[in-house]
Amino acid sequence: MILVTGATGALGALIAERLADRDDTVLGTREPQRFEAPLPVRRIDFDDLDTLITGFQGVDVLLMISAGYGEDDTVMARHGRAIDAAQEAGVGHVVYTSLTADGDHLPYALPHRWTERRLQQSTMGWTILRNGLYAELLAWLAAPSEDGRITAPLGEGRLAAVARVDLADAAVRVTVEAAAHAGRIYELVGERAIGGADLARAHGPHVAYEPETLAQARSRLSASGAEPFQVPMLVGTFSAIAAGFMCRTGGDLRQILGREPRSPLVAALA
């Protein structure tokens, strides 16, 4: 049996769609009563150990989508709880959606590396999908204003962005053949790096890219009503891209998909 956690999230929902025709898959979510799903659903709450121990019973392969929305200690506690429960329940293999290695400069990298280490120290089989940042995230971070300006502190930096749907496709392919990917770490970044100027050109001649400073971005984000932990996360993301740490491309995604990855610009503008 396959179980997918976080099935109501943006990535999890795409994965659930792709597994809908299988009779060996169940979906996990914190609020199953609010989830209309094409597959059986179990209550899986990373903050509630009992739901994990019960929900993971009978599971052979666990696709563990990162519960990364929170402070580092919160995320590590959630992931550690899930790994311990999976091991206790007799899960044979865990596929974990992590963060690209080039993201080590990002403020939210530490819980991912901690989780990878915990998985590797467990008695279960494991596969780590080091996902690149979504093209859709870049589009949100650098969205045009009503007057046609993209204002973001990206400088000349570029991001090897990935279409979220490609990461969903890759996760499904690995999960349904987990044994063939045991002990593997995949760097799932894009094959083309894009920046603010590329986004502006893709929007058309009426849109211009105007870099701002990190301080300006911090003030703007702080005034937007973002959660306190979100502001340094987003500013750190801008900083890493601008500094050129997120532009390295790779071919693991194409290898898993068996096709060319989708254009990050097309995904960003969709």
Outline where the language-model segments fall.
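Amphipathic terminal alpha-helices
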Residues: D252, L257-A270
